[in-house]
């Protein structure tokens, strides 16, 4: 992977790091399913940052962060297909990795990539085992389907976070604009009150129409601000 592509990929990763904790349970359920379907004791959902692997959900391990330099998933995000390592001790890429030669003595690995909306491999849904093995075609398809589900969940969360930020900006704009609009309206309403105290015999219906229009405008401004404030934060 060239430097420009990797920088773009890492930029895509940054969009998903602040994951909504309300959906953490969804991710935990998916890693549990991956573990059961693939009959593997360890399963992870992780994002691949520039030099670290950030674990967002897990089963069978206590790790939260791992260096990318010795990570199986570093190789996985560089390809588009599912990656399978049947026996890590026989694969020169991983035979000397710390997790292979030391506890937990990983032997098997399989992963499906998590994709951003613009097509970058931002992370993986992966499973590990301490004994060499392979997966059936059905297991591989299920792993890919679960990874797609993770991608959809994370993209939904990113979109909702973006919408909340836009709503905050919109509320602030509405607050400022309502002040700017209501100030002259309030002045006009004040003048109207003074005019009502003065006998006005020529075309009084014009005064009533103007008074009604100003009050309607004031009410409309209040409604707009109230509607904007109802948007989710």
Regions found by a protein language model. Name each.
Residues 176, 180-183:
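Residue-level recognition of the "H+4" position in the DHp/HisKA helix
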Residues 107-118:
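A short, aliphatic-rich beta-strand micro-motif
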Residues 190-201, 212, 230:
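Conserved C-terminal segment of the DHp
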Residues 65, 128-145:
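Regulatory loop-to-helix N-cap segments in sensory/regulatory domains
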Residues 3-6, 136-143, 152-169:
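Interdomain signal-transducing alpha-helical coiled-coil linkers
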Residues 53-56, 63-107:
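Regulatory sensory and allosteric helical modules in signal-transduction proteins
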Residues 208-233:
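Conserved DHp (HisKA) dimerization/phosphotransfer helix of two-component histidine kinases, i.e.
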Residues 1-65:
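Intrinsically disordered, low-complexity terminal regulatory regions
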């Amino acid at each position: 992977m060239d430097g420009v592509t990797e920088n773009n990929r890492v930029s895509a990763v940054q969009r998903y790091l602040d994951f909504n904790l309300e959906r953490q349970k969804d991710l935990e359920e998916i890693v549990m399913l991956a573990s059961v379907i693939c009959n593997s004791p360890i399963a992870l959902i992780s994002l691949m940052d520039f030099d670290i692997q950030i674990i967002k959900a897990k089963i069978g391990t206590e790790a939260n962060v791992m260096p990318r330099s010795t990570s199986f998933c570093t190789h996985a995000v560089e390809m588009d297909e599912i990656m399978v390592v049947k026996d890590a001790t026989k694969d020169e890429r991983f035979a000397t990795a710390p997790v292979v030669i030391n506890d937990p003595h990983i032997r098997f690995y399989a992963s499906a990539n998590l994709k951003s909306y613009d097509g970058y491999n931002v992370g993986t849904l992966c499973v590990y085992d301490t004994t060499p093995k392979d997966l059936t075609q059905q297991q591989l398809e299920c792993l890919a389907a679960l990874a797609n589900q993770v991608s959809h969940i994370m993209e939904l969360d990113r979109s909702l976070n973006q919408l909340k930020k836009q709503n905050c900006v919109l509320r602030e704009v509405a607050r400022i604009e309502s002040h700017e609009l209501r100030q002259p309206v309030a002045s006009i309403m004040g003048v109207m009150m003074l005019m009502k105290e003065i006998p006005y015999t020529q075309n009084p219906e014009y005064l009533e129409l103007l008074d009604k229009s100003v009050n309607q405008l004031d009410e409309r401004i209040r409604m707009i601000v109230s509607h904007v404030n109802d948007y989710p934060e």
